[in-house]
């Protein structure tokens, strides 16, 4: 429900800005509507394709192997724990995979709750107790339960649409104010490209802010599924080992770890570990 409300609210905001720009520039609504449709087509296509391919892409990027038949006690425990938590959360059983990495991490991905994946690194299994790992797994199950993959796709699609539309509308306004029609085309594309970079930069800040908000929700969900102390213990273990590195690409948005920074923290997908621990410790 929340992702639908977010989608509607964000689109309403885009339409408001759309009408403001039309009134300020005097550009005909028919032309602007065509541009908006084009921007939405480009803005959502990439995000939706990425979502549909997310599971396969994640397996390929990490070299993770899906557990079909457990080969040892660790794999058996991992499979049983994930499936038990999924059942408790009212979800279908996700695929479970292990990938080789020196980084203590885990992530969830997939196009829907019915086609999801939970993957953990070998370093996590080797460096965490089972209680701590259970907290991490519950965190990932919470991402799936909350529909975070779909929510981020919708948000990214709206942001992409706004970036393309706003950049090209402003570029059109600048180009139309030029006296020489011969240079209009070059000015238009130059301004559009520069503004798409600038607006894309700002859009990334919005997407990462929402990602950090979503991490707090997944932590709270883990506390409900596995117990608050297990999630706190897992986060403290991450602190004790090291401040984990950010994962590459889109996988970072659904991983367990996070690191802090000054201005760069605005572009991190996760809040600082100490803030996540504090939020859990002060929650009821």
Swiss-Prot record:
GO terms for biological process: proteolysis. It is an enzyme of class 3 (hydrolase). The active site is at 140. It is a multi-pass membrane protein. Its cofactor is Zn(2+). GO terms for cellular component: plasma membrane. Coiled coil: none annotated. Pfam families: Peptidase_M48. Its EC number is 3.4.24.-. InterPro entries: HtpX_protease, Pept_M48_protease_HtpX, Peptidase_M48. The chain crosses the membrane at residues 4-24, 33-53, 147-167, 187-207. This is Protease HtpX. It comes from Mannheimia succiniciproducens (strain KCTC 0769BP / MBEL55E). The lineage of its organism: Bacteria, Pseudomonadati, Pseudomonadota, Gammaproteobacteria, Pasteurellales.
């Amino acid at each position: 429900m929340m992702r639908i409300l977010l989608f509607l609210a964000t689109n309403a905001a885009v339409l408001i800005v759309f009408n403001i720009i039309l009134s300020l520039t005097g550009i005909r609504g028919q032309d602007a509507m065509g541009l908006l449709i084009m921007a939405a087509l480009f803005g959502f296509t990439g995000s939706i394709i990425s979502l549909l391919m997310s599971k396969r892409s994640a397996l390929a990027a990490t070299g993770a192997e899906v557990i079909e038949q457990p080969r040892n006690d660790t794999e058996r425990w991992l499979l049983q724990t994930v499936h038990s938590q999924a059942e408790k959360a009212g979800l279908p059983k996700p695929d479970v995979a292990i990938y080789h990495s020196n980084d203590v991490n885990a992530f969830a991905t997939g196009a829907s709750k019915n086609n999801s994946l939970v993957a953990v690194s070998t370093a996590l299994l080797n460096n965490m107790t089972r209680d701590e790992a259970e907290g991490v797994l519950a965190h990932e199950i919470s991402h799936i339960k909350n529909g975070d993959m779909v929510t981020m796709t919708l948000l990214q699609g709206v942001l992409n649409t706004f970036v393309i539309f706003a950049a090209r509308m402003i570029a059109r306004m600048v180009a139309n104010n030029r006296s020489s029609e011969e240079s209009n085309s070059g000015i238009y594309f130059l301004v559009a490209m520069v503004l798409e970079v600038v607006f894309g930069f700002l859009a990334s800040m919005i997407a990462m802010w929402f990602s950090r908000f979503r991490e707090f929700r997944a932590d709270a969900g883990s506390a409900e599924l596995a117990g608050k102390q297990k999630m706190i213990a897992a986060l403290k273990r991450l602190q004790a080992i090291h401040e984990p590195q950010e994962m590459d690409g889109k996988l970072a948005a659904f991983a367990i770890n996070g690191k802090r920074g000054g201005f760069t923290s605005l572009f991190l997908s996760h809040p600082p570990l100490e803030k996540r621990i504090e939020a859990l410790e002060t929650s009821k």
